[in-house]
Amino acid sequence: MKIKKLISALVLGSMLVGLSGCNITDFSAENLLRPPKAVGDEAEIEQLIAKTADSGYTLKYPKNGKFRSAIIMTDLDGNDSNEAVAFFRNSAETSSVHMLVMYSKDNSWEIASDNIFETTDIDSVDFADLTGNGKAEIIVNSTTYTPNVGKLSCYSYSEGKTNEVGSGQSCSSFVTGDFDNDGTSEIMSFVLYTTENEALASMLDYNEDSKSLYAKAMANMDPNVVKYKNIAVTKLDNDITGIVVDGTSANEVTNTQVIFYSRDLAILRNPLFKEKAKNITRRSSQVICSDIDKDGKLEIPVTLDLPKQSSDSKNIYADKIIWNSFDTPKEALVAKQAVIINYDYMFMMDYADKWSENKVTAITDLESETTSFYAWNGTKLDTELFEIKVFPVSEWESGKSDDFTLITKDDKYAYTFNNINPDTQISLSDDEIKTGFSTLDQSGI
């Protein structure tokens, strides 16, 4: 809110200055959001950037990934002292971005290298020890003129010097981790399909002899995916570290691909993708892989339709989600938990064992902010079992909701239930409703 007020004040100020005949030439959002004047180390670093740029500069912020700052402080060489990596565009240049690597020596900041990318933006940045020497490499994906496909570059730093380790691989997104369990990190690079690139996952490893990166293993990816929604490193089983990739097609259908390196076969695997077969995780829902049981491993969602009347086009039916672990030896999903998810009000309800064989469905009424759970008799709705109602906190605290019992609340909403029919064979008790309910935030979704 403070930032919004600051921007509003600055915009108003610019209008007044404009009316007085002054000319403001660089009033971009990036400049508006630049931090206050730096002091100490930050001031010295910005002075080095200004000196290098000479004619003025604009800080460039990575668009994606873990590191979103234009000036990143991190210990590259493992000496417990931070180096600085800064991204900026020289005001005299329009199609290049500089990466300035700086280090502190004798209480003064010096430049290790000024690396120039032929690009207008930096997509993402990461740091990982790819060589096994205890020092972190700088990994940069810079944008290109091909939409959603960038160019991967990698640099090592030691004793005030920066060397290029690898450059030139096409890359839409990347993650790092020890995927072959050899004690050092690798880069897993993903490329979306274009007329110039196959949809591909590549595991890039460091070669000590050539002092460069090479593709140790590759796997085909789904060419119908046009956008990545979520790419996350996760433990699978048998001490294997893999990646789950949630991607979306042009018609907004999402699927999940699981990528891992098979040490026995020395190949990269993507078993959920088969060229002539439907991916079992294909779904129109917005859910992505999540660690729903907090065991440190991401679960993979499979969406099933709840039963509905064929002629019913009015009601909004909830989704049934089966959360699965991944069995690496069998290369198959293993069901762990079934839930009914409501995306409108961001909660889910455990799908009880007694509801097996499509005995229950759920309908959301947006006007009344209620999701009703019904018994299903095979062709139509039967008895209403219970309902979940979402109240604004202020309304709930006013006491105008005597028929409902509180489950949980946050700053905005109170989540409540009314157990309408607790005595059928498939009914839930009050305690079962309370323990089976969770918000998507609570579940990490």
Which positions does each model-derived feature cover?
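Beta-propeller-forming repeat regions
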Residues: 5, 21-364, 370-373, 395-396, ...
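Domain-scale activation on soluble regions of proteins
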Residues: 374, 410-431
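A short acidic-to-branched-hydrophobic micro-motif
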Residues: 375-395
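Sec-dependent bacterial lipoprotein signal peptides
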Residues: 1-20
